[in-house]
Amino acid sequence: MNTENKEITSNWFTNLRDLLCKEFEKIEEKYAQIKGLKPAKFVRTSWKRNGGGCGIMSLMKGEVFEKVGVNISTVFGEFSQEFRSEILGAELDGKFFATGISVVAHLKSPLIPAMHFNTRYIETSKNWFGGGGDLTPFYPEENETAKFHTAFKEACDKYDSSYYPKFKKQCDEYFYLRHRKEPRGVGGIFYDYLNSGNFEQDFAFTKDIGKALLSVYPEIVRSKLFLPWTAEQKEYQLIRRGRYVEFNLLYDRGTKFGLMTDGNVEAILMSLPPVVKFN
């Protein structure tokens, strides 16, 4: 396993965490200032993994972001015997290293889309990058969806013109609730097992995906910061959030990976909305 690669990827995810938290706090500060409220701040909680590694949860509950989490982790060790066959390159000795960032935002306003994003670097006897970002609006708007997709398409096109259509398709297929026969949101991109043979290029691409999120999602939130919404719209948001819960508990690979590697349960389930209704 390459020590330098592990260090620089882990450092980037920490840096991206800081940039995102700063941007989200600025949005809370602006809203609080105009409304005469005390702005919310991120609260950080560190955790250690028994088998090796650690992580930091950054969680904020405010007036704009009902719940937003920005988690980073770096873990290592050996996969359990039954899990090795499910992970690329882990079949022989089960050794692994994984570092990454996971971001989930649930907004108070039902007019502002929820957002999920993660990027990661994993080493076994193989090594690869994975991740992506997707948008879940409760009241979809074509221009907003196009803006989100364009940000990721531009990042993809810098490296390979085939990336965006391929990763968009993978996102649409992945974030699909098979038992309901419906998509979770309006998509984005999703990629896994990315290893072109050029580590520097794959890492640069993964960094640009993070920068794309940083450029587009805060802009979407700000554009709807002060739009009025109704109790009926809020009720609909709470019911649709149930789909988010269903997906994360039934299908999400990150949830399964975290639980199977003895990760921090609170960090793993950070993605769940704070309030949900099931009819």
Curated annotation (Swiss-Prot):
One of its GO terms (molecular function) is protein homodimerization activity. A divalent metal cation binds at H106, H116, H149, H179. Signal peptide: none annotated. Disulfide bonds: none annotated. InterPro entries: Coprogen_oxidase_aer (IPR001260), Coprogen_oxidase_aer_sf (IPR036406), Coprogen_oxidase_CS (IPR018375). It catalyses: coproporphyrinogen III + O2 + 2 H(+) = protoporphyrinogen IX + 2 CO2 + 2 H2O. One of its GO terms (biological process) is protoporphyrinogen IX biosynthetic process. Substrate binds at S102, N118, T119, R120. It is found in: Cytoplasm. It comes from the Bacteria. The record marks H179 as: Important for dimerization. Pathway: Porphyrin-containing compound metabolism; protoporphyrin-IX biosynthesis; protoporphyrinogen-IX from coproporphyrinogen-III (O2 route): step 1/1. Belongs to the aerobic coproporphyrinogen-III oxidase family. Involved in the heme biosynthesis. Catalyzes the aerobic oxidative decarboxylation of propionate groups of rings A and B of coproporphyrinogen-III to yield the vinyl groups in protoporphyrinogen-IX. This is Oxygen-dependent coproporphyrinogen-III oxidase. It comes from Rickettsia prowazekii (strain Madrid E). The lineage of its organism: Bacteria, Pseudomonadati, Pseudomonadota, Alphaproteobacteria, Rickettsiales.
